A protein has these predicted regions:
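Betabetaalpha-Me/HNH-type nuclease active-site subdomain
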Residues: 76-173
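N-terminal module-boundary/linker segments of secreted carbohydrate-active enzymes
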Residues: 33-37, 42-112
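Intrinsically disordered, low-complexity regions enriched for glutamine and histidine
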Residues: 29, 37-40, 51, 134-137, ...
């Protein structure tokens, strides 16, 4: 009897040992993935992403223009009031795309005028605008010009105001009805048959560029543009206080901007 009891006890101990083994194994399986996942989360390195410049959506700007009739008040440009004037004899040798850093431009406007912004900058620098780089203009250039007066200007004279619905289409890239009207009269008319063609070319060139979403020094801006825009890699660019200049030949290939 004692022998039977000992044997039975031994069997019970073995069963308990086996049960304990499988219980511990199951717990280990259920718990082990968690540290691995956590480790993966900790060691994963996020890839750098290109952040495009911030801007109000084009459709929002167009809707705003339609709802606000004051956007299109007194936007015509009078040639006789222009301080530089007309030059119909200068040749068109190449083109310069002038881009403006809107936050910098608006800071200067506010420093100069405070809350009494001139009508030409009210739309661009309004309190609800979040624009980055915008198109100042696309300028036909004379390669032999010695001053700004030597470039083509007002080649078709003092033109009438453009239709409001046409201007509204391009406020997202050139945020000002007077800006658009003036650039067409002063510059676009010297190389394009219509304002529609002129603005469409501006939009095409602007859309082909990647632009930084922050203010950079001149050299930093040039490096950034060449790094993110292969077509600019070997080109000489131009810049002023808040503007960037990119030049194109008459076949719309990027070329060096003149240093003078």
């Amino acid at each position: 009897m004692k022998k039977f009891t000992s044997t039975l006890s031994l069997i019970v101990l073995v069963v308990l040992a086996i049960w304990q083994y499988f219980t511990d194994s199951t717990k280990t399986k259920n718990q082990s993935p968690s540290p691995v996942i956590e480790q993966t989360k900790q060691t994963k390195v996020s890839e750098p992403k290109f952040e495009p410049q911030f801007e109000t959506k084009r459709t929002d700007i167009e809707k705003s223009a339609v709802k606000n009739p004051n956007v299109f008040t007194n936007y015509d440009v009078i040639m006789r009031d222009d301080p530089i004037g007309q030059n119909v004899k200068a040749p068109v040798d190449y083109y310069m795309l002038a881009l403006s850093w809107s936050p910098g431009f608006c800071d200067i406007q506010r420093e100069k005028y405070g809350n009494q912004l001139p009508s030409s900058s009210q739309y661009q620098c309004g309190s609800n605008r979040t624009l980055g780089w915008v198109v100042h203009g696309l300028w036909p250039q004379n390669a032999n010009a010695l001053s700004v007066t030597d470039h083509p200007r007002f080649c078709k004279g003092d033109l009438p105001a453009l239709p409001k619905d046409l201007l509204a289409q391009y406020l997202a890239i050139s945020p000002g009805e007077q800006l658009l009207q003036g650039e067409w009269e002063k510059h676009g008319s010297c190389a394009f048959d219509s304002a529609q063609q002129y603005f469409a070319k501006e939009q095409e060139l602007f859309s082909s560029l990647k632009l930084p979403n922050q203010n950079l020094s001149r050299n930093e801006l040039f490096r950034w543009m060449k790094q993110h825009n292969p077509q600019l890699k070997n080109a000489y660019l131009g810049a002023s206080r808040n503007e960037l200049f990119i030049c194109y030949d008459k076949k719309w290939q990027v070329m060096n901007c003149q240093s003078k």
